[in-house]
Amino acid sequence: MGAILGKKIGMTRLFNEKREAVSCTVIEAGSCFVTQIKRTDKEGYDAYQVSYGERKEQKVSKPLQGHYKKAGVTPGYTLVEFSFAELNQELAVGSQVSVEGFNVGEKVNVLGVSKGKGFAGVVKRYNFGGGSRTHGQSDRLRAPGSVGGSSDPSRVFKGTRMAGRKGSANITVKNLEIFKVMPESNLIVVKGSIPGPNNSYVKIISSKK
């Protein structure tokens, strides 16, 4: 049980004990350090702030340099927060969060941001059928069609599916099984796919179900 911040390396295939090829995703989960502990009496909620990776001090802003120095850790690439229940362990500022808290066969939830597709029409974004290909139609093949009534309701309903930005959404994939844990390399291998492109950051949290 636990949680950690990781970076998606990519997908591969590994063989299980039955010599079956299993599609897996490799996640580099470390090095992660606790940079701040937030409390209800001060910040209004309880959470651990965790950094990922190590980078040169001059690569981060002056305020963040002071923040990392106060915690006594090397500056990282990003900062995220985990609730006390998610990390499920007592940690002090400056302590390291490692992959050793995870076991093979354990189920985890992976949270990430999906790949951005840019501005997309309704056919690509929502799998609309488009207009008729005949009966004199010339420019309505990929159009959404009518989006609102006339006198009643005389408006477009909220949430009507239209063209817009596709992707770049927060996605959670639940109950992925851990296929392999490599503490010496800070790697976790999970079965199946996870959201986001390669080198994107993801949160790995033990599943409660």
Curated annotation (Swiss-Prot):
Q: Does the keyword rRNA-binding apply?
A: yes
- Identify the GO cellular component terms for this protein: cytosolic large ribosomal subunit
Q: Which GO terms describe its molecular function?
A: rRNA binding; structural constituent of ribosome
Region annotated Disordered, chain positions: 131-155
Q: How does it assemble?
A: Part of the 50S ribosomal subunit. Forms a cluster with proteins L14 and L19.
Give the family from UniProt. Answer: Belongs to the universal ribosomal protein uL3 family.
Gene Ontology biological process: translation
What protein is this chain from? Large ribosomal subunit protein uL3
The record describes the protein's role as: One of the primary rRNA binding proteins, it binds directly near the 3'-end of the 23S rRNA, where it nucleates assembly of the 50S subunit.
User: Which intervals of the chain form a coiled coil?
Assistant: none
Q: Superkingdom of this entry's organism?
A: Bacteria
Keywords, A to Z?
A: Ribonucleoprotein, Ribosomal protein, RNA-binding, rRNA-binding
Looking up InterPro entries in the UniProt record yields:
Ribosomal_uL3, Ribosomal_uL3_bac/org-type, Ribosomal_uL3_CS, Transl_B-barrel_sf
Presence of keyword Membrane? no
- Native source species: Chlorobium chlorochromatii (strain CaD3)
